[in-house]
Amino acid sequence: MKLSMPRFDQAPVLVVGDVMLDRYWHGGTSRISPEAPVPVVKVDQIEDRPGGAANVALNIAALGAPASLIGVTGQDEAADSLANSLQAAGVRSVFQRIAHQPTIVKLRVMSRHQQLLRIDFEEPFATDPLSLATEVDSLLEGVKVLVLSDYGKGALKNHQSLIQAARAKGIPVLADPKGKDFSIYRGASLITPNLSEFETIVGRCTDEADLVAKGLQLLQDLDLGALLVTRGEHGMTLLRVGQPALHLPARAREVFDVTGAGDTVISTLAAAIAAGEDLPHAVALANLAAGIVVGKLGTAAISAPELRRAIQREEGSERGVLGLEQLLLAIDDARAHKEKIVFTNGCFDILHAGHVTYLEQARAQGDRLIVAVNDDASVSRLKGPGRPINSVDRRMAVLAGLGAVDWVISFPEGTPENLLSQVKPDVLVKGGDYGIDQVVGADIVKAYGGTVKVLGLVENSSTTAIVEKIRKN
């Protein structure tokens, strides 16, 4: 399946559910308490992040989609912190604030990137379902997807009225379910239980075929449009009536924290479906996003640039021939990993041993090598009639096949100054016997603190000589 970045800016989503505040106390531990055999944490940083349904809305906004949120809080500083964080992220939030009840807070004590303790401050909310339904109905206009983010904390009391209200307007309903009774989600377009939640309803699944059979039966029993079971390190499985099961492997390279991974899945699904993507493509994007977010510590959101870079890697543009936009994204990703970018340029009309040796030497100056290639018109202007021998597409394809080369891009001008000013490599490399100041673009690179290097050419290796020899023979 070919992945592409949706137009999230045209995908408004409404989230309704249990909001909470994820609070982190970070500090160092260097001694054991004299009062009890427990570590003493000297707190030096307090961090608040939206959690639960608020994290779903935050994830949707981080992807660039317009996000609205309806939830229930207390009348306290935790609710104020939530409201401020969401407003800063561009999320429109409407809270039903209840006096004499605390906003749900999950406090985690962290040291050296390890969670030592979690303390929960919560009481089940006594909400007004009619008032909440009225708020939802007023915000459904113009929305393309409704998300029910259910943590079983009391914000969602009348699931069916919300599902039916959205369906009456032709709005898909996605639900992240909770509890032992999934009948409350009857008629939803899609529900996204994890494997444990799914098996609580249908019983233990002995193998994949059993999971599929039980899932299809649940689809029919609850009149669901689709069912997505998230399965941790085994990826996720999408089930639809009359369609083959779609199994997607897990994408995580390293797992640091699974907190909020389910929120990332449903938020990416919702934003992608709202943007007009079909369900298999939306699920593939959600799987990719989940693989990124579990590599982060704590409740975290995935940004649009992160997802775009992941798509580029997935589609094979981590290496090879790129356009300028793809190249700039690849460079951003490389720099995020502290990689040094090397740049060289030329016509590379007939690739020979001298070129290969030179490119290997250039690659050794850093971690990633960009080769910028003159297009056909500029080669003709530089080299004269009859050149190039090979078209720019063929020249770039050959260069992209070399192990020393990471990215290849063409440029139309006679010199690469315009490209250099946008790419801003750490090292500019040129082959020849002239001084550094004579290298075209050296002034641009040196102006922002980059390095310019001149490498010697391999003797008796020349494209011009090869062309002349061919013509004589």
UniProtKB/Swiss-Prot annotation:
Renumbered residue ranges of the record's region Cytidylyltransferase: 343-473
Record-listed ATP binding positions: 194-197
Ribokinase: annotated segments: 1-318
Enzyme category, top tier: transferase
Cross-referenced CDD domains: RfaE_like (cd01172)
Reactions catalysed: D-glycero-beta-D-manno-heptose 7-phosphate + ATP = D-glycero-beta-D-manno-heptose 1,7-bisphosphate + ADP + H(+); D-glycero-beta-D-manno-heptose 1-phosphate + ATP + H(+) = ADP-D-glycero-beta-D-manno-heptose + diphosphate
PROSITE patterns from the UniProt entry: PFKB_KINASES_1
Assigned keywords, A-Z: ATP-binding, Carbohydrate metabolism, Kinase, Multifunctional enzyme, Nucleotide-binding, Nucleotidyltransferase, Transferase
GO terms of molecular function: ATP binding; heptose 7-phosphate kinase activity; heptose-1-phosphate adenylyltransferase activity; phosphotransferase activity, alcohol group as acceptor
Active-site feature positions: 263
Pathway assigned in UniProt: Nucleotide-sugar biosynthesis; ADP-L-glycero-beta-D-manno-heptose biosynthesis; ADP-L-glycero-beta-D-manno-heptose from D-glycero-beta-D-manno-heptose 7-phosphate: step 1/4; Nucleotide-sugar biosynthesis; ADP-L-glycero-beta-D-manno-heptose biosynthesis; ADP-L-glycero-beta-D-manno-heptose from D-glycero-beta-D-manno-heptose 7-phosphate: step 3/4
GO biological-process terms attached to the record: ADP-L-glycero-beta-D-manno-heptose biosynthetic process
InterPro entries, per the entry: Bifunc_HldE (IPR023030), Carboh/pur_kinase_PfkB_CS (IPR002173), Cyt_trans-like (IPR004821), PfkB_dom (IPR011611), RfaE_dom_I (IPR011913), RfaE_dom_II (IPR011914), Ribokinase-like (IPR029056), Rossmann-like_a/b/a_fold (IPR014729)
EC number(s) per entry: 2.7.1.167, 2.7.7.70
A matching Pfam family: CTP_transf_like
Self-association and partners: Homodimer.
Family listed: In the N-terminal section; belongs to the carbohydrate kinase PfkB family.
UniProt-listed HAMAP family: HldE
Protein purpose: Catalyzes the ADP transfer from ATP to D-glycero-beta-D-manno-heptose 1-phosphate, yielding ADP-D-glycero-beta-D-manno-heptose.
Protein name (database record): Bifunctional protein HldE
Gene field: hldE
